[in-house]
């Protein structure tokens, strides 16, 4: 219709006509989606000049608006190239004519209301196309028009003439005003225009019907289904009867006939389940529908005409004809096409009675006579006045697609289409349509009443009603909730305009509908535009094509509006008309609804509206432009259109107008319009031509011809701008053949597309695009951007875009409001473009102002004090991060509280280049006295006590540098810094609260079962949250408000005891060094509030403590002036210490031996380890005797075995140990079962060891804190956190279990001296044996000494932590140890590993193997012992001793067993390889060898000792767990573990092993992960005996290390390893030597003044507020972190995103799980059907990562089973292991595979 308008507009001679074009402009210009109102102002002004891009007035509010809203579709979908809806020039949005008309049609508030509504709707919906006001208005305006028409629906007759011209010609403000104008506009001029419009509408309808046949067909079929299920329903209902009739009418005869033809030609409805090429019931139903429609049409149409002239079809037909004629005269083509011809064509094509056809024509004429709405109708009328009327509904949908064109037609089309539509929608659309129509207008009743209503006014009124209803409807749609209400509204409104309403139903479909439809359509369109700017653009293209039917398009909008607008008009026949109309619009509204929501009910039309997205897409078509549909697509579209009885579906579901495929896409995007969507599908499914032809196969070609002829005539008369096919074309295609007509029209449209009015045909969808429409929004530039692309491929492009827009914009904008929350940059002219990269992140919820002084005022007002109480510091964003060479946090400037007078510190950033209202923003607020001192003191003590004992450290990526190699938290797992999270936080898994599936979430969960402690913690945090919230509200009210928005809804996810709960979670960081990061998961516009608690020595103002933690902003530097611009004052601050300018930031470089593993890696390893652990356990069960033997050999050392296990666990820790004492400690502890440690660093090192362990859960490096309780680890639980010493190897910390340390110690010793390491291990083992026996690493300290003492008790008696310390410190002792090691001690070393195995005395036994091993390693047994060989020897001794001589023979010990002489070198590597995978071998030979050899040892496991070793290792190795276990266990306490401990643990004392391992996360499981890498390191540390050890370290590959250790063993690496170990330790920064050697000043940061590093020194009880999501922040590492007595506890309160569901989102989760369960069940059924095995089925059905892993591992287990021949000792291992050593050396695969 819009297109019609445009063409009309082209003719300046015809004011009314031009008014129409203006209106058309509305339709086709930017303002309206595709409605005339959408026409650009130029169109308004220039009539046909719609294509020209009009200029912004520059004076209206939108023009003066400088910033984009960011929420509209134009903003969100930049591809549309549309200006922000809120910035769209009002002038461009409105057509001059439209405005006038709007004024004329004040009744409905057409112009203003429509515009406003449109704009509003557009804004609300994020107009898709161009400026909200313009295009949006266009769409919405139509709504307004529709309403205005509705309001003036009654007056339509009277006002029709004036309104008609106004609508047609006055079209500037066509959208809303047009319809009113219709009423007011002069009849003649308007009539002419109306006729043109009607022709265009008819053409549009035809094209649309054709293009939307699929949609129509789908709708019809749906209606059919509905009716079959509830036969009487739609068609027969009273009020609905009207709609039902409309349904029938709505599904015009053309539609029904088209559907019938398609059905007969084998084009079954999309949803048809019938077998065979046809759907008998459907055919029968269609035939019956057609008959009823014809009957109904005869009656209704007469009624329609009745309102115009008589009340009968005959009269209406004549009336319509006259109107048409008048219109035609204006539009020569139309005149050329006699009404009778149209009637005949309609009757023929639609298979309706001539009387009905005449009635339709009469209505069309009436519509023509009426203002533009009438014109619109006439247009439809011309081809098939009434027939088109049914298409009006159809068009209405189309108008949704391309509202401008269809809206006009839809009214008429609705009427004439009512029968066809009815025929078509009855399946589905009808019901929907009826409801929709009900909303819009009752088609049946309208028809009946139409004749009764004033003929002239009625059509106009009807159009108006349609528009009104449509606009209401659209509005409703926009407000989705209103959708249904809109329907009712439509009914009510329709009744409101009784006179118009009665005819309105028919007219709305026919004449009135066109006018109202465009308006309604525009509104709907606007809504849709908002939702789918791009789609709308495409639609606009279509609309522009349909431009001719500008009036028609308004009609289409009427259809949209009918829900609301028609209400006023349909008062007289609200029920029937509504219903009938609903059915007709059902195609559109319903279709739209279907498309968008996928709802089928007729009422859904409103629903469709609700689903503004889908609808938007459809209206988008009309508003932006009628999409140019290609000829081929035209048939498809037609088909769709035909299928959906009403063109409305097509227009409504823009897709319908588009080519079938695009249409489908559109429909898919807007499934809410069932009819539309299905029609689209239908359109696609059947051939386009078929779709066109179904209604009247014969007429279809004629329709094409007629359309072309009409187009030519229109073109000739109105210029290309009027590229609207003649009325005949419309009639032909109108009802069913609207599609038919459309095909031809499509071509014509396509042909005209280049002109002012673009007639684009896609299948059944004909889009008349007026550049006006686009112009308004920047014309085609704005909307066309999308539209044009679609225009080129037309359907294809459009569909693609709409789909994309539906999927993307609709989905992302509507479905994901998350982005809507994202604030946009304030609009300012300060800089051309805001680049956060240069000026820093932009946000203002902490506060902002034009100057720093304004910030002071702001903060003084908030805080309530002035002067010195408020301190403001300026910082400058440089973007250069200050960090140490290792990537750890540093500070260059420290801002401290200078005096007690200072209460509030505020850091502000001046945005470079800005002088606007937000030139200065607050980035940090620090209240020095945030909480009472007493509360702070109490909290510090309570939290320290509780978390030290029961805390379960959280693994955080920010705890490590980018390389994951730093140990900033410290290396002692028991004391290293750690963070503990409580409360609710966002989970990627749930995309919501992590407690989504927790029936009874423990928000303050501690390790183990400690409800009392948890309650204490809960109370502490709840009280604190309650205390802090008011301060937060006072200091950052906006951020606070943002965080309490959803408090009531998600109260379960909030902390605090009083109303006003901004926080959801809290993280307690105890001496935790957070590396530079942003809290990405925080609420977008929220903040983190950090409460700081400091140690007793740091609670005074002005005193700088020895150690402190600073909060750093790494990207900022201090300004050289103070807040007042004084450089002197700033210098004075520096001099007084208020600002401390650092020249260096010396910090010990603490480094992990190997990079910490990522959570993903840990998880994968944990899974593997768990799987292997199970295997190992099974193996243990299978070889319990051997294990027992080993245990027995370890005998008295049973506890030792436990310790060994622990040691093994700890061994994993060894890895870190290599780096530093803490490493050793850590390693030991970690493997001791420190999940955190393992998972963190060691885990990284020993992939197998931690896989199962809890550690895997932690991202911390091995060095990172282990759970204080270590309750996870059975053994560790006894000892408090210190006992565990999870993380690191705080060599200095004897707290670490000595046992762990022991192993770790020997590991350290390895560091210091390879030999020492092993001896250390030995001693540790001895010590650990008991310790492990004790199962408490905490006891390890003393026991650790024994462990060391075990062999080197004196050796490194570093005391309790000799292990770790020795690692680091006792280099000499280590060497000494090494010496010993070579001797018995070496054996012992191995022994202590082995010691557990009771083979410490097996030097000879081992010696033999050792030499082998050594040989392999390139060492003599003693050398080996001393180097790694020493331990090897020791191991050998142990191995040999305890073992199985064969195994021993093969390997020195269990581990050596692995190495059995035969396979020693190769085997070790082999096993190492395997183990390597498990990390065992890589650990050091001392332990690692054990682990490795245990690989063989596992075979050797048959030996008591060997088996112990082997088996323990086996578990590690075999189960991956074995390897891991062995690795970690061996590493930390690998030897003990490997030898007897492990043995005992695995077999003899599985409990211990479990305990140890359990804490580790699996007896061997955990160890393996840590073991591999840690073992390696441990080996290095210890063993570094393998000169390669270090290499291994360097490689950090468990495998490599495993190999290296052996290799090292091969080669003398004793000293080098020691050095390496030391070095590593140093690297770790754990060793004292390391500390001395590895200190860094981060000098490079201080050489460049632009490198950032502004830090604040938070005081005790202070509250710091910052936007952690946007600002990069960090906390500096402490010199001596000790979470048992933390230097600083920072309690970080935050609220993560998406925590806005009640009960943590449990309902959503359960629903999701139910769905997944159903899917899984389906998969299982499918698997069963396919005959897949259980495992295969699992893999096939669900991706349980376990499935593949478990399956694969079991296979490996089988191999292991063979390896269980591990028990076969050397024999199988010799050949197989050798091969496997290399062939199977895999970092990822557990050695257990081969064991």
Swiss-Prot record:
Name recorded for this polypeptide: Methylcytosine dioxygenase TET3
EC number, as in UniProt: 1.14.11.80
Skewed-composition ranges (Polar residues): 370-380, 513-529, 682-696
Disease: Beck-Fahrner syndrome: A developmental disorder characterized by mild to severe intellectual disability, global developmental delay, hypotonia, autistic traits, movement disorders, growth abnormalities including overgrowth or poor growth, and facial dysmorphism. Both autosomal dominant and autosomal recessive inheritance has been reported.
Binding site for Fe cation: 1077, 1079, 1673
Major localization listed first in the record, in broad terms: nucleus
Cofactor: Fe(2+); Zn(2+)
Alphabetical UniProt keywords: Chromatin regulator, Chromosome, Cytoplasm, Developmental protein, Dioxygenase, Disease variant, DNA-binding, Intellectual disability, Iron, Isopeptide bond, Metal-binding, Nucleus, Oxidoreductase, Ubl conjugation, Zinc, Zinc-finger
Assembly information from the UniProt record: Interacts with HCFC1. Interacts with OGT. Directly interacts (via C-terminus) with the DCAF1 component of the CRL4(VprBP) E3 ubiquitin-protein ligase complex.
Binding site for Zn(2+) 1: 57, 60, 63, 89, 914
Reactions that this protein is recorded to catalyse: a 5-methyl-2'-deoxycytidine in DNA + 2-oxoglutarate + O2 = a 5-hydroxymethyl-2'-deoxycytidine in DNA + succinate + CO2; a 5-hydroxymethyl-2'-deoxycytidine in DNA + 2-oxoglutarate + O2 = a 5-formyl-2'-deoxycytidine in DNA + succinate + CO2 + H2O; a 5-formyl-2'-deoxycytidine in DNA + 2-oxoglutarate + O2 = a 5-carboxyl-2'-deoxycytidine in DNA + succinate + CO2 + H(+)
Domain notes: The CXXC zinc finger mediates binding to CpG-DNA. It mediates binding to DNA sequences containing unmethylated cytosine or 5-carboxylcytosine in 5'-CCG-3' DNA sequence motifs.
Tissues with expression: Expressed in colon, muscle, adrenal gland and peripheral blood lymphocytes.
Purpose: Dioxygenase that catalyzes the conversion of the modified genomic base 5-methylcytosine (5mC) into 5-hydroxymethylcytosine (5hmC) and plays a key role in epigenetic chromatin reprogramming in the zygote following fertilization. Also mediates subsequent conversion of 5hmC into 5-formylcytosine (5fC), and conversion of 5fC to 5-carboxylcytosine (5caC). Conversion of 5mC into 5hmC, 5fC and 5caC probably constitutes the first step in cytosine demethylation. Selectively binds to the promoter region of target genes and contributes to regulate the expression of numerous developmental genes.
Stretches the record annotates as Disordered: 142-172, 229-251, 370-396, 408-461, 478-704, 1345-1366, 1395-1430, 1608-1638
Annotated organism of origin: Homo sapiens (Human)
Residue span of region Interaction with DNA: 985-998
């Amino acid at each position: 219709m819009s297109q019609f308008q445009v063409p009309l507009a082209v003719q300046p001679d015809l004011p009314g006509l031009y008014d129409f074009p203006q209106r058309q402009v509305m339709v086709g210009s930017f303002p309206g989606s595709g409605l005339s109102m959408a026409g650009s102002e130029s169109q308004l002004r220039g009539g046909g000049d719609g294509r020209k891009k009009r200029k912004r007035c520059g004076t209206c509010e939108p023009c003066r608006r400088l910033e984009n809203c960011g929420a509209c579709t134009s903003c969100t979908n930049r591809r549309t190239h549309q200006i922000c809806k809120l910035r769209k020039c009002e002038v461009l949005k409105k057509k001059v004519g439209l405005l006038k008309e709007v004024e004329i049609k004040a009744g409905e508030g057409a112009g203003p209301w429509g515009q406003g509504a449109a704009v509003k709707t557009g804004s609300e919906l994020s107009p898709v196309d161009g400026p909200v006001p313009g295009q949006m208005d266009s769409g919405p305006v139509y709504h307004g028009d529709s309403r205005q028409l509705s309001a003036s629906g009654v007056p339509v007759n009277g006002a029709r003439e004036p309104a008609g011209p106004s609508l047609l010609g006055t079209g500037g403000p066509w959208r809303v005003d047009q319809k009113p104008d219709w009423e007011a506009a002069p009849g003649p001029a308007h009539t002419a225009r109306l006729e043109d419009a009607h022709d265009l509408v008819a053409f549009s309808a035809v094209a649309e019907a054709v293009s939307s046949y699929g949609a129509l067909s789908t709708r019809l079929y749906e209606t059919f289904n509905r009716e079959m299920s509830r036969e009487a329903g739609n068609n027969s209902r009273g009020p609905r009867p009207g709609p039902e009739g409309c349904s029938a009418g709505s599904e015009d005869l053309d539609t029904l006939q088209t559907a019938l033809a398609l059905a007969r030609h084998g084009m079954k409805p999309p949803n048809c389940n019938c077998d065979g090429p046809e759907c008998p019931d459907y055919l029968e139903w269609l035939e019956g529908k057609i008959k009823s429609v014809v009957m109904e049409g005869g009656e209704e149409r007469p009624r329609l005409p009745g309102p115009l002239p008589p009340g009968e079809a005959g009269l209406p037909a004549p009336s319509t004809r006259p109107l048409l004629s008048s219109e035609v005269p204006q539009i020569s083509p139309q005149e050329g096409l006699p009404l009778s011809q149209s009637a005949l064509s309609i009757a023929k094509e639609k298979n309706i009675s001539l009387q009905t056809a005449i009635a339709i024509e009469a209505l069309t004429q009436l519509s023509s006579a009426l203002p533009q709405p009438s014109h619109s109708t006439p247009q439809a009328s011309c081809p098939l006045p009434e027939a088109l009327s049914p298409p009006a509904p159809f068009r209405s949908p189309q108008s949704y697609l391309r509202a401008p064109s269809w809206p006009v037609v839809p009214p008429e089309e609705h009427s004439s289409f009512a029968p066809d539509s009815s025929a078509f929608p009855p399946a589905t659309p009808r019901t929907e349509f009826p409801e929709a129509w009900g909303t819009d207008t009752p088609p049946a009743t309208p028809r009946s009443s139409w004749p009764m209503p004033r003929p002239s006014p009625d059509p106009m009124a009807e159009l108006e009603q349609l528009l009104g209803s449509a606009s209401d409807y659209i509005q409703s749609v926009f407000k989705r909730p209103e959708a249904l209400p809109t329907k009712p509204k439509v009914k009510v409104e329709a009744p409101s305009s009784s006179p118009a309403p009665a005819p309105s139903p028919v007219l709305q479909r026919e004449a009135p509908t066109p006018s109202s439809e465009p308006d309604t359509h525009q509104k709907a369109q606007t809504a849709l535009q908002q939702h789918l700017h791009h789609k709308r653009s495409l639609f606009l293209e279509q609309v522009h094509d349909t431009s001719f039917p500008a009036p028609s398009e308004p009609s289409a909008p009427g259809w949209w509006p009918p829900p609301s607008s028609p209400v006023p008009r349909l008062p007289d026949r609200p029920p029937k008309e509504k219903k009938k109309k609903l059915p007709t619009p059902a195609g559109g509204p319903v279709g739209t609804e279907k498309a968008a929501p996928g709802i089928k009910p007729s009422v859904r039309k409103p629903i469709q509206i609700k689903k503004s997205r889908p609808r938007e897409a459809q209206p988008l078509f009309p508003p932006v432009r009628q999409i140019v549909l290609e000829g081929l697509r035209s048939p498809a579209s037609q088909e769709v259109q035909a299928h959906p009885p009403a063109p409305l579906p097509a227009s409504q579901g823009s897709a319908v107008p588009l080519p079938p495929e695009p249409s489908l896409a559109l429909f898919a995007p807007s499934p809410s319009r069932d009819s539309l969507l299905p029609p689209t599908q239908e359109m696609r499914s059947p051939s386009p031509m078929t779709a066109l032809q179904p209604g009247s196969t014969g007429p279809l070609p004629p329709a094409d011809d007629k359309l072309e002829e009409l187009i030519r005539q229109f073109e000739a008369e109105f210029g290309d701008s009027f590229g609207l096919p003649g009325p005949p074309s419309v009639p032909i295609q109108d009802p069913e053949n609207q599609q038919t007509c459309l095909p031809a029209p499509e071509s014509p449209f396509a042909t005209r597309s280049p002109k002012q009015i673009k007639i684009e045909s896609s299948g059944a969808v004909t889009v008349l695009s007026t550049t006006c429409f686009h112009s308004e929004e920047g014309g085609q530039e704005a909307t066309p951007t999308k539209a044009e692309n679609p225009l080129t491929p037309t359907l294809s492009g459009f569909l693609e875009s709409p789909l994309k827009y539906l999927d993307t914009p609709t989905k992302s904008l509507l479905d994901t409001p998350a982005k809507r929350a994202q604030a946009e940059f304030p609009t300012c002219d300060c800089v051309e473009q805001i680049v956060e990269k240069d000026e820093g992140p932009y946000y203002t919820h902490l506060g902002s102002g034009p100057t720093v002084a304004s910030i002071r005022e702001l903060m003084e007002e908030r805080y309530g004090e002035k002067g010195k109480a408020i301190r403001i510091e300026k910082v400058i964003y440089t973007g250069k991060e200050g960090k140490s060479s290792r990537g750890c946090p540093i500070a260059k400037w420290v801002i401290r509280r200078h005096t007690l007078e200072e209460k509030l510190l505020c850091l502000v950033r001046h945005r470079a280049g800005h002088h606007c209202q937000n030139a200065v923003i607050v980035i940090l607020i620090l209240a020095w006295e945030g909480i009472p001192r007493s509360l702070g003191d109490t909290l510090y003590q309570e939290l320290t006590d509780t978390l030290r004992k029961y805390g379960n450290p959280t693994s955080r990526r920010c705890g490590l540098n980018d390389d994951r190699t730093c140990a900033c938290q410290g290396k002692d797992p028991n004391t290293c810094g750690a963070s503990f999270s409580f409360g609710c936080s966002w989970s990627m898994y749930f995309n919501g609260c992590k407690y989504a599936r927790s029936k009874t979430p423990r928000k303050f969960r501690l390790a183990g079962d400690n409800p009392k402690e948890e309650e204490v913690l809960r109370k502490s945090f709840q009280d604190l949250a309650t205390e802090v919230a008011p301060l937060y509200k006072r200091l950052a009210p906006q951020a606070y408000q943002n965080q309490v928005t959803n408090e009531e809804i998600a109260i379960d996810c909030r902390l605090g005891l009083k109303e006003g709960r901004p926080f959801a979670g809290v993280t307690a960081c105890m001496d935790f060094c957070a590396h530079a990061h942003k809290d990405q998961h925080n609420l977008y516009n929220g903040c983190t509030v950090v409460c700081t608690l400091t140690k007793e020595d740091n609670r005074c103002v002005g005193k700088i403590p020895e150690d402190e933690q600073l909060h750093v902003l790494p990207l900022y530097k201090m300004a050289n002036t103070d807040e007042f611009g004084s450089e002197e004052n700033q210098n004075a601050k520096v001099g007084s210490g208020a600002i401390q300018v650092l020249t260096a930031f010396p910090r010990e470089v603490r480094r992990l031996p190997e990079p910490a593993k990522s959570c993903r890696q840990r998880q994968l390893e944990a899974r593997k380890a768990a799987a292997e652990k199970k295997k190992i356990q099974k193996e243990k069960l299978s070889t319990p005797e051997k294990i027992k033997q080993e245990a027995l050999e370890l005998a008295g050392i049973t506890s030792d075995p436990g310790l060994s296990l622990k040691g093994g666990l700890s061994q994993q820790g060894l890895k870190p140990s290599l780096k530093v004492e803490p490493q050793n400690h850590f390693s030991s502890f970690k493997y001791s079962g420190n999940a955190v440690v393992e998972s963190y660093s060691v885990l990284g090192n020993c992939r197998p060891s931690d896989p199962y362990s809890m550690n895997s859960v932690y991202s911390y490096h091995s060095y990172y804190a282990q759970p204080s309780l270590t309750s996870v680890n059975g053994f560790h639980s006894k000892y408090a956190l210190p006992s565990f010493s999870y993380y690191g190897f705080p060599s200095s910390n004897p707290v670490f279990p000595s046992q762990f340390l022991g192993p770790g110690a020997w590991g350290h010793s390895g560091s210091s001296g390879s030999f020492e390491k092993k001896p250390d291990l030995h001693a540790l083992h001895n010590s650990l044996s008991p310790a492990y026996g004790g199962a408490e690493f905490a006891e390890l300290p003393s026991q650790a000494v024994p462990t060391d003492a075990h062999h080197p008790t004196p050796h490194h008696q570093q005391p309790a932590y000799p292990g770790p310390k020795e690692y680091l410190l006792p280099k000499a002792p280590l060497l000494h140890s090494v010496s010993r090691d070579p001797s018995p001690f070496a054996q012992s070393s191995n022994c202590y590993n082995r010691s557990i195995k009771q083979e410490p005395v097996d030097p000879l036994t081992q010696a033999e193997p050792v030499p082998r091993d050594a040989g392999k390693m390139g060492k003599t047994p003693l050398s080996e012992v001393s180097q790694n060989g020493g331990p090897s020897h020791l191991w050998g001794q142990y191995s040999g001793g305890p073992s199985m001589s064969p195994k021993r023979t093969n390997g020195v010990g269990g581990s050596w067993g692995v190495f059995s002489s035969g396979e020693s070198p190769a085997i070790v590597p082999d096993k190492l390889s395997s183990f390597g995978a498990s990390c065992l071998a890589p650990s050091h030979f001392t332990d690692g060898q054990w682990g490795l050899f245990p690989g063989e040892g596992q075979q050797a496991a048959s030996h008591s000792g060997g088996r112990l070793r082997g088996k323990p290792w086996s578990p590690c190795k075999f189960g991956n767990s074995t390897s891991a276990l062995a690795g970690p266990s061996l590493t930390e306490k690998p030897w003990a573990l490997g030898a007897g401990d492990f043995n005992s643990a695995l077999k003899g004392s599985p409990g211990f092993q479990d305990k140890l391992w359990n804490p580790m996360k699996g007896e061997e499981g955990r160890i393996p992960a840590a073991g591999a890498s840690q073992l390696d390191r441990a080996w290095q540390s210890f063993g570094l005996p393998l000169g390669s050890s270090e290499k291994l370290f360097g490689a950090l590959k468990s495998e490599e290390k495993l190999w290296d250790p052996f290799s090292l063993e091969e080669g003398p690496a004793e000293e080098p390893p020691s050095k390496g170990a030391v070095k590593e330790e140093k690297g770790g920064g754990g060793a004292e030597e390391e500390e001395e050697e590895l200190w860094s000043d981060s000098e490079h940061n201080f050489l460049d003044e632009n490198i950032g590093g502004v830090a604040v020194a938070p005081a005790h009880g202070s509250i710091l507020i910052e936007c952690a999501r946007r600002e990069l922040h960090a906390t500096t590492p402490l010199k001596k972190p000790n979470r048992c007595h933390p230097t600083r506890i920072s309690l970080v309160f935050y609220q993560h995103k998406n925590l806005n569901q009640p009960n943590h989102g449990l309902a959503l989760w359960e629903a999701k799980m139910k769905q997944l369960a159903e899917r899984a069940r389906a998969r299982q059924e499918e698997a069963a059907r396919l005959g897949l095995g259980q495992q295969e089925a699992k893999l096939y059905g669900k991706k349980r990562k376990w499935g593949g892993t478990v399956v694969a591992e079991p296979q490996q287990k089988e191999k292991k089973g063979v390896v269980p021949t591990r028990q076969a000792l050397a024999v199988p291992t010799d050949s197989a292991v050798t091969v496997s050593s290399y062939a199977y050396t895999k970092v990822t695969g557990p050695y257990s595979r081969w064991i």
